[in-house]
Amino acid sequence: MLVRLLVAAIMITFFVVAMRKPKIIPSGLQNVAEIMLDFVRIHIAEEILGKKEGRRFLAVLVPTFFLVLFLNSSSVIPFLNISSNARAGMPLILALFGYIAFIYAGVKRYGFFKYMKSSVVIPNLPVALHLLVIPLEFLSTFILRPATLTIRLLSNMLVGHIILVLLFSATNLFFWQLNGWTALSAVTLAAGIAFTLFECLVIFLQAYIFALLVAVYIDLSLHADEH
């Protein structure tokens, strides 16, 4: 909990400081913040939803992307060394946030009953097949989407944390053997540093993929009647 609060405080402080006195020609932290915000707007929101709907749902996609990004980053910060998303609670909350967003998008456009019908009923199917397809579509749309969002983020960050722990624990173990095994500490240390750099890439990719999937699910809800 303390790690999550600390990361949230760092994220809020970053954007408050960066955008406190915005300039027409950005520089410093404002430039970094605007580049990051433009990335979400152009490459996630507008890319998937188009300009009109993309701007409308920026209020969902921007906090989703940056919360995942900053919470993931704690896995490579010294003395923290574990992502808040390596535990089930936070990924589940983030997935539920996306879940509420895409259901809201569909209900807002079609109304509750039409949206539910459009989401689970595939037109022009034989009546008998509806008995099979409707439960599967309901499971896929309303159960598996938040579940897979949670599991994907949790598993990727947890696996990365475990590998880093193993590599640096092995480094410590081998180094203090003071025999032939000591030389291996250099190998595991180098592997740990290399994997830390790789984990930085994973941190960004997982934030991007998570926000991208939320955008895709919102888009599917907005076009639920287009089977």
Where do the protein language model's features map onto the residues?
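Selective transmembrane helix interface/packing segments
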Residues: 1-227
